[in-house]
Amino acid sequence: MAKVESFTLDHTKVKAPYVRLITVEEGPKGDKISNYDLRLVQPNENAIPTGGLHTIEHLLASLLRDRLDGVIDCSPFGCRTGFHLIVWGEHSTTEVAKALKSSLEEIRDTITWEDVPGTTIKTCGNYRDHSLFTAKEWCRDILEKGISDDPFERNVI
């Protein structure tokens, strides 16, 4: 079975919330794709409920694209503690952390239900499982802790 980097990470050593560069892969023509760990809550101590996580996912899909070039995808971890962010090229963890912080601030402060994309039966595969209230509450809690650009040392941006 292939070795997956995420499953070799010592989850007891990280200090969430943080942004971590997992890997930079280079394609046959030299194109680079970077994978980031956007860890919002401490592993094995908490998990974001699916309704809130789902709403944060839909909002980050747009908000991160507004703030970073080359966003390919932002997908939640099955453990519900954060997201994978996949981008063309490379960004520093500080740059990604600033974009994430700004996005979470917008969710917390200004987003209304009408702003949440993909919440109908035609536009979402599980449209009933959303909660903007839960998303806002978790964004508030995450931002109160501060987002670090280092997974092992608290270097809050």
Curated annotation (Swiss-Prot):
<feature type="binding site">
    <location>
        <position position="58"/>
    </location>
    <ligand>
        <name>Fe cation</name>
    </ligand>
</feature>
<dbReference type="Pfam" id="PF02664">
    <property type="entry name" value="LuxS"/>
</dbReference>
<dbReference type="InterPro" id="IPR003815">
    <property type="entry name" value="S-ribosylhomocysteinase"/>
</dbReference>
<comment type="subunit">
    <text>Homodimer.</text>
</comment>
<dbReference type="GO" id="GO:0043768">
    <property type="term" value="F:S-ribosylhomocysteine lyase activity"/>
</dbReference>
<dbReference type="GO" id="GO:0009372">
    <property type="term" value="P:quorum sensing"/>
</dbReference>
<dbReference type="InterPro" id="IPR037005">
    <property type="entry name" value="LuxS_sf"/>
</dbReference>
<dbReference type="InterPro" id="IPR011249">
    <property type="entry name" value="Metalloenz_LuxS/M16"/>
</dbReference>
<keyword id="KW-0408">Iron</keyword>
<keyword id="KW-0456">Lyase</keyword>
<keyword id="KW-0673">Quorum sensing</keyword>
<feature type="binding site">
    <location>
        <position position="124"/>
    </location>
    <ligand>
        <name>Fe cation</name>
    </ligand>
</feature>
<comment type="similarity">
    <text>Belongs to the LuxS family.</text>
</comment>
<feature type="binding site">
    <location>
        <position position="54"/>
    </location>
    <ligand>
        <name>Fe cation</name>
    </ligand>
</feature>
<dbReference type="GO" id="GO:0005506">
    <property type="term" value="F:iron ion binding"/>
</dbReference>
<comment type="function">
    <text>Involved in the synthesis of autoinducer 2 (AI-2) which is secreted by bacteria and is used to communicate both the cell density and the metabolic potential of the environment. The regulation of gene expression in response to changes in cell density is called quorum sensing. Catalyzes the transformation of S-ribosylhomocysteine (RHC) to homocysteine (HC) and 4,5-dihydroxy-2,3-pentadione (DPD).</text>
</comment>
<protein>
    <recommendedName>
        <fullName>S-ribosylhomocysteine lyase</fullName>
        <ecNumber>4.4.1.21</ecNumber>
    </recommendedName>
</protein>
<keyword id="KW-0071">Autoinducer synthesis</keyword>
<keyword id="KW-0479">Metal-binding</keyword>
